[in-house]
Amino acid sequence: MQIDIVQIVGLGLIATFLSLIVKEQKPTFAFLIVVFAGCAIFLYLVDQIYDIIRMIEKIAINANVNMVYVETILKIIGIAYIAEFGAQLTKDAGQGAIASKIELAGKILILVMAVPILTVIIETILGLIPSMS
């Protein structure tokens, strides 16, 4: 399914317009419109995300890269996007403090997942440096 940016922007603008109209009478309902629009846009893009993941996996297989590293990097990217999405929704609800905690949790989880890759990179670099003894 081909996604057009005009459709995504249109959905976002319609949701924004509806949210602004409803916000005066029912602020909670206005927030739900925003959440629904955000989720709809994300779901609209799932096929493209899937295609990108498959393409990256094919490139990694052709380049003879260990799939554990590729999967870890894809998980890290997923954590970053999900944390950003959750933080933005929380900010939209006026809860900046909670949003910052979501962002912090995402950063910590990314760091935890990156440690094995960083370890391999450091070991590889150290293996390339001639020993001084």
Swiss-Prot record:
Query: Which keywords accompany this UniProt record?
Result: Cell membrane, Membrane, Sporulation, Transmembrane, Transmembrane helix
Tell whether Transmembrane helix is among the UniProt keywords. yes
Q: Name one GO cellular component term.
A: plasma membrane
Q: Which GO terms describe its biological process?
A: sporulation resulting in formation of a cellular spore
Please give the Pfam families that the UniProt record associates with this protein. SpoIIIAC (PF06686)
Its subcellular locations are: Cell membrane
> Is Transmembrane helix tagged as a keyword?
yes
Q: How is this protein situated with respect to the membrane?
A: Multi-pass membrane protein
Query: What are the transmembrane regions?
Result: 2-22, 29-49, 108-128
Name the major location. Answer: membrane
NCBIfam families from the entry? spore_III_AD
Q: In its UniProt entry, what is this protein called? A: Stage III sporulation protein AD
Annotated source species: Bacillus subtilis (strain 168)
Organism classification? Bacteria, Bacillati, Bacillota, Bacilli, Bacillales
Gene name of the record: spoIIIAD
